[in-house]
Regions:
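Acidic (Asp/Glu-rich) sequence patches and key acidic residues
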Residues: 1-164, 171-173
Length: 173
């Protein structure tokens, strides 16, 4: 059975307009609390940076990264790590302040999703990806990360500040 990564992106902003699943009560409560505290709504939060579509009541995202790459999965979250790679971090879970669309999709997957984690774009850009691009006698891994490195370049277009972009992901079997 194969394992796939469900890779979503968020942007830290005071804008609240996005396409995708919404929880009207959460949006209302955030706005109301902000107005009560500040006199106007200026609160920053994470919103989805993905493009979402609704197909007969089911929401799905056009994910920035959607390849099946067990080598990358091992690096990101110690998933399918038959390579004995030291992961960047053990899975961190879904951030409490994650945007509603991501929480929605995680809930839709219920127990079939696992190893939930996240990194800011800044964290991913600081990784020395070349150290993982090694040529071993049994397999050439020199280009296994090219697609993901291209994704990182595309993610830079979401916001000039890489700390304002967060990648939230999980895996299925």
């Amino acid at each position: 059975m194969g394992c796939d990564c469900h890779f979503f992106t968020e942007r830290w902003t005071n804008q609240k307009n996005y396409e995708g699943p919404k929880d009207i009560q959460i949006n209302r409560d955030i706005k109301l609390n902000s107005i009560l505290e500040n006199g106007e709504h200026q609160e920053y939060s994470w919103i989805t940076a993905d493009t979402w579509t609704n197909d007969d009541g089911y929401w799905s995202a056009d994910e920035y990264y959607d390849d099946r790459n067990y080598f990358l999965f091992a690096i990101l979250a110690n998933v399918r790590n038959g390579y004995r790679i030291e992961p960047l971090a053990e899975p961190r879970g879904i951030p409490e302040d994650s945007c509603y669309p991501i929480k929605y999709i995680v809930n839709e997957w219920k127990g079939d999703g696992h190893s939930h984690s996240y990194f800011t774009l800044k964290e991913l850009l600081e990784v020395d990806w070349d150290k993982y691009c090694v040529k071993l006698p049994e397999v050439d891994r020199t280009n296994w990360l090219d697609d993901f490195k291209q994704t990182l370049k595309e993610l830079k277009e979401i916001d000039k500040n890489p700390e304002n972009v967060r990648c939230v992901f999980f895996f299925d079997n």
